[in-house]
Amino acid sequence: MARRAFIDTQVALWLAKGDSRLNSGTLKWLNSSSETVMSALSIAELEIKAGIGKLALPKDFAELFLNQGIKIEAFSQESAASLSRFPSLVRHDPFDRMILAQAGAKQDTVFFTADRALVALGLDWVVDCAH
C-alpha cells in the first residue's frame, strides 16, 4: 500500500481545478496513495484570501476536495509542536510553515508542494509537484 499523501493549499486548488501545472508523476502518486490529506488550515487560508478579494471561491468549495476523496485533517497540538523542526522558515508564510509541520508530524507521509522554499529544504519526504 502506498504511503499517505499530504497536499498543500496550492496543490489542493490545482487538483480541484484540474490544473495542468501538476506533473504527471504527482498525479500518479496521488492516485495510488493509501490516503490523500489536506489541512483544515488550507481551508482557512483559502477563506481568508477569498475574504480579501484575492480569490473567488464557490460557496461550498470544501466539498470539491471531499468529493475527490481528499480528507481534511485538523491542526493538532502535535502539529503545533512540530513547528520548531523548521527554524529556517521563521520568516516564511505562517500557513505554509504550519501545513508543513502538520504533514511532518506523522510518519509515512509524503508532502506535495510547489513552494520553492519548502522544496529547497531538501527533506526526503517533500516532493516538488510542479512542472
Predicted regions and their residues:
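Short, conserved active-site loop motifs that form the nucleotide-linked donor/cofactor pocket
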Residues: 34, 70-71, 109
